[in-house]
From Swiss-Prot:
Membrane topology: Peripheral membrane protein
UniProt name for this protein: ATP synthase subunit beta
HAMAP family cross-referenced by the UniProt entry: ATP_synth_beta_bact
Gene behind this protein: atpD
Key word ATP-binding present: yes
Family: Belongs to the ATPase alpha/beta chains family.
Keyword Nucleotide-binding attributed: yes
Enzyme class: translocase
Annotated ATP binding sites: 155-162
Protein's organism: Buchnera aphidicola subsp. Acyrthosiphon pisum (strain APS) (Acyrthosiphon pisum symbiotic bacterium)
Assembly information from the UniProt record: F-type ATPases have 2 components, CF(1) - the catalytic core - and CF(0) - the membrane proton channel. CF(1) has five subunits: alpha(3), beta(3), gamma(1), delta(1), epsilon(1). CF(0) has three main subunits: a(1), b(2) and c(9-12). The alpha and beta chains form an alternating ring which encloses part of the gamma chain. CF(1) is attached to CF(0) by a central stalk formed by the gamma and epsilon chains, while a peripheral stalk is formed by the delta and b chains.
Amino acid sequence: MATGKIIQIIGAVVDVEFNQDSVPKIYNALEVKNKQYKLILEVQQQLGSGVVRTIAMGSSNGLKRGLIVTDLGHYIKVPVGEATLGRIINVLGETIDNKGALKNNQSDKIEYWEIHRSPPSYRDQASCREILETGIKVIDLICPFSKGGKVGLFGGAGVGKTVNMMELIRNIAVEHSGYSVFTGVGERTREGNDFYHEMNDSQVLDKVSLVYGQMNEPPGNRLRVAFTGLTIAEKFRDEGKDVLLFIDNIYRYTLAGTEVSALLGRMPSAVGYQPTLAEEMGLLQERITSTKNGSITSVQAVYVPADDLTDPSPATTFAHLDSTVTLSRQIASLGIYPAIDPLNSTSRQLDPYIVGDEHYETALGVQSILQRYQELKDIIAILGMDELAEKDKLLVSRARKIQRFLSQPFFVAEVFTGFPGKYVSLKDNIRAFKGIIKGEFDDLPEQAFYMVGSIEEVIEKAKKL
């Protein structure tokens, strides 16, 4: 293995000099190791005369010029397979949950894969029209997820992206008994801790691999941690399993790329983002795909800066998604959770050829009633309800019931709301909304529709009011 020495350190950027005949390749992992220190660097640029510019995967505190650096001769490698289930690892595949080294039940040997891999060839890729039931009413009705598809949860700060993601993991792990990989990219350490304990309490931890690179980590770490999680998911997929990949938050991945780009001296583009924004997003998203062996269904939380969906980061992410779930601050302010906007959320799966005519017509009926209610709100605010035609009064009444019925108590939020969590099957979901549209429940008070699961619970609640 070739060795070099550190000649310059500027924060997370470290320049290393090698002999000209043994210069490491781009993205190779380099190791700095002495009695006090062990740090992995990733090669980003070859500057000429044997010098490479690298990004540190950990803190560069304590580094000094002249330290010996070893070229490991490969990209960063991480453990994959069932040994990672129920454990928390970092970007380098090291355990950070104080439970000791990874153990493999089936054999002593744990497999390691490089995090930089090519996407599957066109010949190996496969598409699937099967719907993935989540048990969340508004998602299953308005923006259904496809097995092997990509879903984005878009929302500003504090509208419920992480809570929605935790509920999806809980529902899919409990109801569908599949494997999940959760990748925390630049998010709060507290949330990562809460998430671990929530999964443990729900008894689904043994089906989830957790990969964390939190917001206190250097930018190189946050830029690569999504690839670590994806590599673990790819291993499960190639073993013939249907795996769920959760990334929270894809915006922090973009932000880490912006920081690295600035550190490397690249000229920024629109709104200060890196000039390679579309390419970096594509590198990650193109690998999240299904093959003939198994599928990867990905759910990605996307922070929307200043609630502006035209910002380059969320706008670039949009192009890669099959379903977009948009969380609205306006709906959250009404106390309706999950605060998903049914008029701004879309799915390619909402097609009569895929979901069937009944589901498609019910979803469109719900959206048209809510859209008409939205248009009438200005008239109601100025003139009041009494000035509306009888037909519109009835429509407003149904719209308010639909709006409240789209709320749902979550299992992961039981401690905050005091309501026990509910899972609603797609069949019951369609039947209930179809009934509301047809006016079967016009005689029930609208408060009976708030924070319940099925329509039977609405009828029970109405009797007590």
